[in-house]
Amino acid sequence: MAESFKEHLQEAFEDLGADNLRKFKSKLGDRRQEPRVTKSAIEKLKDEIDLADLMVGVFTSKDAVSVTVEILRAIKCNAVADDLLRNTGQSESKGALSDESKCASSKAVSKVAFSKVNFIDEHWKELIDRVNNVDPILDILRQKKVITNEDYCTIRNKETPQKKMRELLTGPITCAGNKGKEVLYDALRESNKFLMDDLEDAE
């Protein structure tokens, strides 16, 4: 049954055409409800098969259909949404996730958090060597209370970006543990998108 849902999703995405598929991906990346799909994950999609795999992987099969229909309605692709509902035998969702999906959502969120921590651990040296603009990262970390005002001033006073990153990673981030690394990852992606994409593509 899961495979059948995936096939129907793939067919729906193929029916959208290039322009509407681009709109769908944009809306999916902007979606705020959990579980969320990261824009970096969307950027790595090669075709409609990858998108169907992503939807079923992040959500359960039935909820992948509900979320897809929700986004199709938002981008005015109502005919495709109606066909998908009819082909899968689903009724219009009111936005509530099933218990099965909530469990899967929790696991998905945990997996994303783990991958962020792993990224920081694995790219420690590259981050020290290649992050050139550290101050915006410090601003975010201070706002999120990962570092103190004293940490902020101490690190900003370091002479080079490399010294700033080394002090940040070996000091406050190590003390903050996994939660600190998750926030650092998000701050790096916000302020150093191309570097982060390059490091992730190299994995």
Curated annotation (Swiss-Prot):
What CDD domains does the annotation carry? CARD_ASC_NALP1, Pyrin_ASC-like
Entries under InterPro entries matching the protein:
CARD, CARD8/ASC/NALP1_CARD, DAPIN, DEATH-like_dom_sf, NLRP_Inflammasome
Tissue expression pattern = Expressed in the kidney, intestine and gill. Expressed at low levels in the heart.
So what does mutating residue 22 to E actually do?
A: Abolishes speck formation and impairs inflammasome activity
**Listed name of the protein:** Apoptosis-associated speck-like protein containing a CARD
| Description of its domains | The pyrin domain mediates homotypic interactions with pyrin domain of other proteins.
What is the gene name? pycard
Give all residue intervals belonging to the CARD domain: 112-203
Q: What task does this protein carry out?
A: Functions as a key mediator in apoptosis and inflammation. Promotes caspase-mediated apoptosis. Induces proteolytic processing of caspa and caspa-dependent apoptosis. Involved in innate immune response by acting as an integral adapter in the assembly of various inflammasomes which recruit and activate caspase-1 leading to processing and secretion of pro-inflammatory cytokines. Caspase-1-dependent inflammation leads to macrophage pyroptosis, a form of cell death.
Q: Which organism is it from?
A: Danio rerio
Q: How does it associate, per the subunit comment?
A: Self-associates (via pyrin and CARD domains). Interacts (via pyrin domain) with caspa (via pyrin domain). Interacts with caspb; the interaction only occurs in the presence of nlrp1. Component of NLRP1 inflammasomes. Inflammasomes are supramolecular complexes that assemble in the cytosol in response to pathogens and other damage-associated signals and play critical roles in innate immunity and inflammation. The NLRP1 inflammasome is composed of the signal sensor nlrp1, and the adapter pycard (asc), which recruit effector pro-inflammatory caspases caspa and/or caspb.
GO process annotations (BP): activation of innate immune response; defense response to bacterium; inflammatory response; innate immune response; intrinsic apoptotic signaling pathway; pattern recognition receptor signaling pathway; positive regulation of inflammatory response; positive regulation of interleukin-1 beta production
Q: Where is the Pyrin domain?
A: 1-91
Source organism, top-level taxon: Eukaryota
User: One Pfam family, short name please?
Assistant: CARD
Molecular function (GO) terms for this protein are: cysteine-type endopeptidase activator activity; pattern recognition receptor activity; Pyrin domain binding
State if 4Fe-4S is listed as a keyword: no
**Stated consequence of mutating residue 47 to R:** Abolishes speck formation and impairs inflammasome activity
Up-regulation conditions: Up-regulated in response to infection with the bacteria E.tarda.
Q: Enumerate the UniProt keywords alphabetically.
A: Apoptosis, Cytoplasm, Immunity, Inflammasome, Inflammatory response, Innate immunity, Tumor suppressor
Where is this protein localized, as stated in its record?
Cytoplasm; Inflammasome
Phenotype upon knockout?
Morpholino knockdown in one-cell embryos results in reduced caspa activity and impairs caspa activity in response to infection with the bacterium S.typhimurium. In addition, there is increased susceptibility to the bacterium S.typhimurium. According to PubMed:36112693 knockout animals are viable until adulthood and are indistinguishable from wild-type in appearance.
One Gene Ontology CC term in the entry = NLRP1 inflammasome complex
